[in-house]
Amino acid sequence: MRPVVSTGKAWCCTVLSAFGVVILSVIAHLFNTNHESFVGSINDPEDGPAYVIFSYLFRRYPFTISYISPPY
């Protein structure tokens, strides 16, 4: 069975994925600590840790959360 992509391209994807995990972890940490650059403006969320948890759940379970309707 032949590989789908070459070894070099597979390593490139692995490195890019690891870099993305690091960047997203830093952003999540800044929201979680209520850093001023992320939650200090008028239009930014007031509760940083709650925003991080909701973002994680939406990323992890997108179809489950998308079916929850707001109360009217």
UniProtKB/Swiss-Prot annotation:
InterPro entries in the record: Ribonucl_Kappa
Question: By its UniProt entry, which Pfam families does this protein fall under?
Answer: V-ATPase_su_f
Q: Which domain of life is it from?
A: Eukaryota
Give the record's membrane topology. Answer: Single-pass membrane protein
Report the subcellular localization. Answer: Membrane
Keywords of the record, alphabetical order, are: Membrane, Transmembrane, Transmembrane helix
GO cellular component term of the entry, any: membrane
Does the entry feature the keyword Transmembrane, yes or no? yes
Which residue ranges does UniProt annotate as crossing the membrane? 11-31
Name of the protein described by the UniProt record: Putative uncharacterized protein YPR169W-A
- Species whose genome carries this gene: Saccharomyces cerevisiae (strain ATCC 204508 / S288c)
